[in-house]
Amino acid sequence: MTAQRLQLTWYNKDKALIPTETGKYGYTWVDPSDPRYCETHTLVLDDYVQGSQTPKSDEFAYSERADLEPQDDNLLILGESGDVLEALTRVPELAEKYVGKVKLIYIDPPFNTAQTFASYEDNLEHSIWLTMMRDRLHHMKKLLADDGSIWVHLDYAENHRMRLLLDEVFGCSNFIAEFVWQKADSPRGDAQRVSVDQDVILCYAASGSTVMNRMERTAADNARFSNPDGDSKGVWFSDNRSAPTNVMSWQHPSTFAIQHPISGEMIYPAKGGCWRFGRERLLESLNEYAEYASGDVDIAARVANTSLRSDQVRSDIPDLVLVDPASAAQCARTRIDDGNWPEFFVTATSFGRKSYPPNEGQPARSWWPNDQVGHNREAKSEIKALFSGATPFSTPKPERLLERIIHIGSNPGDIVLDVFAGSGTTAAVAQKMGRRWVTCELLESTFTTFTRPRLEKVLNDQDPGGITRTKGERVDATEDGLPDGVSPEDAAKFTSVLNKLIKDDPELKKSVEVKTLKAASKTRRTKEVVNWRGGGGFQVAHLSPACFDYAPELDRVMLTAAATGQTLIESVTANLGFTLLHPDDDYIFDARRGNALLKVVEGVATTEIVDWLASQIQPGETIVLAATTVMDGVRQHLRKLVKGSRVVALPDDVFRYSEGGDQ
């Protein structure tokens, strides 16, 4: 059947990939039913890292974030991202905790740019890269909560292909935005043709339930607001008094002239637009300045001052004119002097409309300049500060960039996932922002040298960089307040420029005018703000070794040398979809799935073992006996003794595979 929607195709799209060597980005094509691809690895828990929180000090100010409870339910894994994702989605204990529970996924995958990085093997052929990413995206989709989102960080090499791949996996209707990050702070002199300044971050929702948090308002956002009239509602700014009209064939009811009470001029909304408010709402404000009434319709003037044709002008929409033009000017001036103006107000020559600060922040914008979220050079400085001048990555990401992503896509206590940990920036920022996190790293050298040490520093408050602290805010320090429209940042810049201009003129420095200007623009910086004080913890884990392999020369599935003891038990349990029973509780059986109990025998399954196991179960329970060798008659004996039970021969009954097609 022909596909009914647009899809990206590539070489071997119907195949799967397995690593050719543990701990590297090298892959081999295999059939999707090959046990080397299908095997579910478990997580082997190593040590648990516990941090400590630094008490508060009078030396600093503290943000609300500094008081968040440090999260301790975090997971740091050494292992290949695909195998880790399979463990998180397939191992019952992990699936229960993470499937459908992850609020935000951020990945900064290998860009496939054919560059040679010290910590990344990034030169993956396009079809391999697409297959690698497709399989991982399908697992990530299972992990995402219904209101979650995925953020994929890319450069020019694979961005266009990844967009189509994300459409295929998540649905094009769930596309949210393509965010553009200005990663460079200067042009590259070694660029061959163009110095690329940006990366892109593709964001997709898990479903229509996904909601993006709004951005907190900054001092710059609020700088345009003032209160020149003593408005009882607080600060405001003069916004556009006109609105675009979508009525093209006839006159909009709010397209008419208003006579100005002071100048007497007939004023119209902007061409192609209408007044922002309806007639009654406008009159409610205008009548505070002078009395208004409906006037005649001047067709010629209306055509000249709007985008209307004469045949579109409506005679039933009159202009608003002054009842007593002679007294209107004085009445209007008096009302202006009284202050606390209405929402549609009169100025000396025109009209204005008040707009108040929104109660909540503003929507995130898709352009992220480096002065807001940092750049590559800033990120490298953060790494150098943590690791004695080392530069382990060519393109690290600044903490401020991850801070914005995590703020927009999650809330404190939510789970954040990154399966390409690198230096651990995502987990570090998530911890500092009160989120739970799961991250994994493929390369053991990166894991032991950078990822884990960095996260340990974060927990022990030994990482003062990144988003840990914020410079104190620049605030007004004048006696009478800064002039309207002048922010503390504006005043500080003015003072800096003024000092440069007069630095070589001692007399000018002493002048009354300069001293007056400095006094009128005086600012100060508040205490440095601490956003993170350490604390929390994380579990360290690594992937279990493979227990199942395929021998092409024999064309059969084999058990590996690692398939022994508890490793074998846990592998069989996971691959059969059972949940482990705790070995310390002296259970006879190893695992349970509903009413079925699993026993793994590394050796021969006999009728005597079956009889013994049957004596240990309760009515209604069944037995799954997995053994490396099964004696004749054992299967029939178990089925007869305990209905619904079965024997699993290892490895053949777990993975039936043959390149000849007998699967």
Language-model segments: what does each one mean?
Residues 1-106, 111-127, 131-135, 139, ...:
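DnaQ-like (DEDDh/DEDDy) 3′-5′ exonuclease domain used for proofreading
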Residues 75-76, 377-415:
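Glycine-rich adenosyl-nucleotide cofactor-binding module
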Residues 441-663:
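PRPP-dependent phosphoribosyltransferase catalytic core
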